[in-house]
């Protein structure tokens, strides 16, 4: 039976019952959706970053240079960049639920095919296809959340969802290290081949589960009663009254603020993707030899990142201050990058500085997104954020390729880390140049 109080709650006069009913309804939606969406992102993100762990063995087996690896890791983002807009168009036509499932299933299949790589060309090809397969996944999640949450509740949900990034690092390191060490030689396969195969399986399974677990919209949710559906639909309908008209692409591309945000995001992402793909190598350089131990130790910087995300996000919201909360971690992350390479002969210090670097540059991502969303609204936000995300993610190509090329050129990590630190500091300086009144909301 339905709870009589729940039925009457939306229409009872006075704010306390209505507020209580609304909060309870959104809490119910969050319990149903957000943990599953985080699971989707964690298993999918593992397929993106496991190449960094596979590198520990596959470069030797396939005789790839550091430059080949860097280009292969980065070319993923060229496919991602080229197919993101077409993917978003298809998502609007078919619906976020179906398209997210399609992304995950095709992503898992392509990731598993990486075990067939023999040549640099094949490596580049499969990474490019992986980028095509993943394109639209993050925007798809954001779009799906807009079908349930109004803007005033959406920011918190996005921030909660993005905890999946450090969580995937915390889980991915030990799991990848375990697979590579204990499956190496099974049926004559090296550990890196088993890594690509076994970590693709959860992505495929969760992709199929998405078709059955997620609902296409509020009306299709059998786990909500009619009063809860009316509340959710009413809030979204009320919000739609204030939507602005769709801006032209020319207006978006001619807005200097959009390009300013693109540069800042690019500078954040340079360090983030460097650590994503090269963290296992940096840990190995610091003196850790066992593949399993490398996987376990790489979880430490991601633990620091998760804690930093939560603390900085709460502080920024409480103080309504955005610029310094973003600039300071970026500078700290840049310092961590430089100090980690200078302390590479001292394992404990190197891991400590890598943790500072990760906490600074990776935790900057959710903090960054509070900037453009502070002055972009409605359709302008949708178009502007798409541009910022696409341009900024090109750092995923530039960063690993630059690191690999400089490592082959100089036979060390120092030049690459200093370049990353310089870009990150320049981005932090740009953040402080943004007028406070534009973003501190």
Predicted feature residues:
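Extracytoplasmic gate region of multi-pass secondary transporters
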Residues: 51-52, 252-309, 365, 369, ...
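Helix-breaking motifs and short loop linkers at transmembrane-helix boundaries and internal kinks
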Residues: 63, 95, 116-122, 133, ...
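Conserved MFS/SLC helix-loop-helix module at the cytosolic interface between two early adjacent transmembrane helices
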Residues: 82-121
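Helix-to-loop junctions at the C-terminal end of transmembrane segments
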Residues: 83-95, 308-321, 407
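Cytoplasmic membrane-interface "Motif A"-like loop-to-helix N-cap segments
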Residues: 92-104, 317-330
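Cytoplasmic helix-loop-helix junction between adjacent transmembrane helices
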Residues: 126-163
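Glycine-rich segments within core transmembrane alpha-helices of 12-TM secondary carriers
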Residues: 156-180, 202-203, 389-399
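C-terminal transmembrane helical hairpin of 12-TM major facilitator-type secondary transporters
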Residues: 322-371
């Amino acid at each position: 039976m339905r709870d009589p109080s729940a039925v009457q709650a939306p229409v009872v006069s006075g704010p306390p019952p209505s507020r209580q009913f609304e909060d309870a309804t959104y809490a119910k939606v969050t319990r149903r959706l957000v943990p599953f969406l985080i699971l989707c992102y964690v298993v999918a993100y593992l397929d993106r970053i496991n190449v960094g762990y596979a590198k520990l063995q596959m470069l030797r087996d396939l005789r790839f240079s550091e430059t080949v690896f860097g280009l292969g890791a980065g070319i993923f983002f060229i496919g991602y960049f080229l197919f993101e807009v077409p993917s978003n168009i298809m998502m609007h036509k078919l619906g976020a639920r179906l398209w997210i499932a399609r992304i995950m299933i095709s992503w898992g299949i392509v990731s598993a095919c990486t075990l067939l790589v023999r040549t640099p060309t094949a490596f580049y090809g499969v990474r490019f296809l992986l980028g095509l397969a993943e394109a639209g996944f993050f925007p798809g999640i954001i779009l799906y959340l807009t079908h349930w949450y109004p803007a005033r509740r959406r920011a918190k949900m996005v921030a909660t969802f993005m905890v999946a990034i450090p969580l995937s690092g915390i889980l991915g390191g030990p799991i990848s290290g375990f697979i590579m060490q204990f499956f190496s030689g099974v049926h004559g396969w090296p550990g890196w081949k088993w890594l690509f195969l076994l970590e693709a399986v959860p992505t495929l399974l969760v992709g199929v589960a998405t078709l059955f677990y997620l609902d296409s919209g509020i009306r299709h949710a059998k786990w909500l009663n009619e009063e809860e559906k009316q509340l959710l639909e009413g809030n979204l309908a009320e919000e739609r009254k204030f939507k602005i008209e769709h801006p032209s692409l020319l207006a978006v591309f001619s807005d200097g603020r959009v390009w300013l945000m693109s540069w800042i995001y690019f500078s954040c992402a340079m360090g983030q993707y460097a650590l994503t793909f090269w963290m296992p190598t940096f840990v190995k350089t610091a003196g850790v030899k066992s593949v399993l131990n490398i996987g376990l130790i790489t979880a430490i910087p991601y633990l620091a990142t998760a804690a930093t995300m939560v603390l900085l996000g709460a502080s920024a919201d409480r103080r309504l201050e955005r610029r310094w909360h973003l600039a300071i971690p970026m500078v700290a992350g840049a310092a961590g990058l430089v100090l980690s390479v200078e302390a590479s002969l001292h394992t404990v210090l190197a891991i400590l500085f890598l943790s500072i670097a990760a906490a600074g540059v990776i935790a900057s991502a959710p903090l960054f997104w509070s900037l453009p969303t502070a002055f972009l609204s409605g359709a302008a936000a949708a178009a502007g954020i798409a541009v910022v995300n696409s341009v900024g993610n090109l750092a995923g190509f530039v960063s690993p390729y630059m690191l690999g090329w400089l490592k082959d050129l100089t036979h060390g990590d120092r030049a690459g880390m200093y370049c990353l630190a310089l870009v990150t500091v320049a981005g932090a300086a740009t953040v402080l140049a943004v007028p406070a009144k534009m973003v501190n909301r």
